[in-house]
Amino acid sequence: MSKMKTKSGAKKRFKLTASGKVKAGQAGKRHGMIKRTPKQIRNKRGQVTLSPQDAKIVKKYLPNGL
C-alpha cells in the first residue's frame, strides 16, 4: 500500500504541537478592518488552538504530522 499523502491546503494552514494539539491562524482578518476597534484587531493576531473536535478532523489531513 502506498504512503498517505498530506493535504497541501492543511499543511499551509495548521501546525501540530509536540503535545498533539493543532494550532491555526486567527480568523476574521482579511477585510473589513475599518469597522473594528484597535483592540479587536490586536486580539486577532497570533494563533489559536483548535477544539478537540476540529483537531481530530485536521489530524486526518496531516498523517505525517507536519
Swiss-Prot record:
One example GO MF annotation: structural constituent of ribosome
Lineage of the species this protein comes from: Bacteria, Pseudomonadati, Pseudomonadota, Alphaproteobacteria, Maricaulales
Native source organism of the sequence: Maricaulis maris (strain MCS10)
HAMAP family in the cross-refs: Ribosomal_bL35
Entry keyword set: Ribonucleoprotein, Ribosomal protein
Stated name of the protein: Large ribosomal subunit protein bL35
The encoding gene: rpmI
Stretches with biased composition (Basic residues): 1-15
Family according to the record: Belongs to the bacterial ribosomal protein bL35 family.
Top-level taxon: Bacteria
One Pfam family, short name: Ribosomal_L35p
GO cellular component, one term: cytosolic large ribosomal subunit
Keyword Ribonucleoprotein set for record: yes
